[in-house]
Amino acid sequence: PLPKPSKAAKRQSKQQRGRATRLVMLEPRSRRGVTVQLGGDIVLGRDPACAIVLEDDAYISQRHVRFYDYDGQPMVEDLGSTNGTFHNGSKLVGAKLLHPGDRVQAGTTVIEAQ
């Protein structure tokens, strides 16, 4: 079965003003607090060539989701993953603008844009 959006992925932090500048991992607990600065292309997946490698998450594709800048704005897009990516609890279709407080779930990993 496919993973369902976790409660943490559905809960959004109070919307903040400004531009998201970093990604902070919330789940799983073993990665909680790990921070990645946004900028350029950041691909998350099981492939060792990814910027964020999650080899121990069975629900993650080799190249699962990409975070990138478009005209200076942080974006997120699913890369055709098998199990999908969720943005604020909804399945991500196409690319979406990332705002501070947005949550992205790929497999069992939940990341918050800050």
Regions found by a protein language model. Name each.
Residues A113-Q114:
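Short, compositionally biased
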Residues Q37-V110:
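Forkhead-associated
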Residues P1-D56, Y68:
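Intrinsically disordered, low-complexity acidic Ser/Thr-rich regulatory segments
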